Amino acid sequence: MLVYLAEYLTQFYSGFNVFSYVTFRAILGLLTALVFSLWWGPILIKHLQTLQIGQVVRDDGPESHFSKRGTPTMGGILILAGIFISVLLWGDLSNRYVLVTLFVLASFGVIGFIDDYRKVVKKDSKGLIARWKYALQSIAALVVAVYLYSSSTMVGETQLVVPFFKDIMPQLGFMFILLAYFTIVGASNAVNLTDGLDGLAIMPTVMVAAAFALIAYLSGHAQFASYLHLPHLPLAGELVIVCTAMVGAGLGFLWFNTYPAQVFMGDVGSLALGAALGVIAILVRQEILLVIMGGVFVMETVSVILQVGSYKLRGQRIFRMAPIHHHYELKGWPEPRVIVRFWIISLFLVLLGLATLKLR
């Protein structure tokens, strides 16, 4: 909103023109979301404690997790509020890429909220029934996928960018909808599965969001996009604001979510953040790069698929427990060691993903 005010005030004082620069607003967006999260975090935690909205811990999980029972959850509300306020202040709300991303954050946030509400308030350990959760995710994802396909006006908006190959950019056509659907739903559930230890999911999310901020800026800049053989997407530049807001809100939340956690994000946070990363990857045409940079999320998801598949087909489990972070806990790794090592893996994969922009 302040973009429009600054644009109006520029006619009276040229200094307000600084707000027309995406980089300047991105910094302000990050700081706004960060300060908001740090300021309101203690207030939200106290309120959640008063309402007795505490984490439900499964009885068959690692014994070290029993102490987490009752820790305030649904802290993802803090993250989403920080992102929304920051983007509403510093983003260009006439940009359809920004609006689509906000819609995804809101819709998947609502799905996660319903799931959390049933678990911690209604005391239903299963939360939202799996088929209903998947159905709601599918509806939201398909709405976005169909809209993006039908509203595309440039060839680059529906091309598939293949890392390491500068000349391979096949036109997806109607398959774009299918790819977008699986990217959004898959990323949403992958981050949700990863969110099992203190700070484990939020830091990789912050790293990937920061990387996408850079990619969005490069894709929105004609010269940089041409130099790096990326599709030039003029609207992508404004996604930098969304990405840096995610970084700021995520770091602010990590202040309270780091081991030992004072609050958990819950499904309201993990489902929304994962879906947001998915739709941003779609908008900047880097779905494959998301698989690389979000490798920790992929690893967690694959471990669950392998575990379930192996048990159903062979009656044997591959891991001591899935997702895989629990496997290492049961092997005797202290929780902080698992968390930090997964962070290091995530950092490596994000840097590897960024390197592919030049290695073509």
Curated annotation (Swiss-Prot):
Pathway: Cell wall biogenesis; peptidoglycan biosynthesis. The keyword Signal does not apply. The keyword Transmembrane applies. GO terms for biological process: cell division; cell wall organization; peptidoglycan biosynthetic process; regulation of cell shape. Keywords: Cell cycle, Cell division, Cell inner membrane, Cell membrane, Cell shape, Cell wall biogenesis/degradation, Magnesium, Membrane, Metal-binding, Peptidoglycan synthesis, Transferase, Transmembrane, Transmembrane helix. The chain crosses the membrane at residues 26-46, 73-93, 97-117, 135-155, 168-188, 199-219, 236-256, 263-283, 288-308, 338-358. It catalyses: UDP-N-acetyl-alpha-D-muramoyl-L-alanyl-gamma-D-glutamyl-meso-2,6-diaminopimeloyl-D-alanyl-D-alanine + di-trans,octa-cis-undecaprenyl phosphate = di-trans,octa-cis-undecaprenyl diphospho-N-acetyl-alpha-D-muramoyl-L-alanyl-D-glutamyl-meso-2,6-diaminopimeloyl-D-alanyl-D-alanine + UMP. GO terms for cellular component: plasma membrane. Its cofactor is Mg(2+). Its main location: membrane. GO terms for molecular function: metal ion binding; phospho-N-acetylmuramoyl-pentapeptide-transferase activity; UDP-N-acetylmuramoyl-L-alanyl-D-glutamyl-meso-2,6-diaminopimelyl-D-alanyl-D-alanine:undecaprenyl-phosphate transferase activity. It is found in: Cell inner membrane. Its EC number is 2.7.8.13. It is an enzyme of class 2 (transferase). It is a multi-pass membrane protein. PROSITE patterns: MRAY_1, MRAY_2. It comes from the Bacteria. Catalyzes the initial step of the lipid cycle reactions in the biosynthesis of the cell wall peptidoglycan: transfers peptidoglycan precursor phospho-MurNAc-pentapeptide from UDP-MurNAc-pentapeptide onto the lipid carrier undecaprenyl phosphate, yielding undecaprenyl-pyrophosphoryl-MurNAc-pentapeptide, known as lipid I. Belongs to the glycosyltransferase 4 family. MraY subfamily. This is Phospho-N-acetylmuramoyl-pentapeptide-transferase. It comes from Shewanella frigidimarina (strain NCIMB 400).
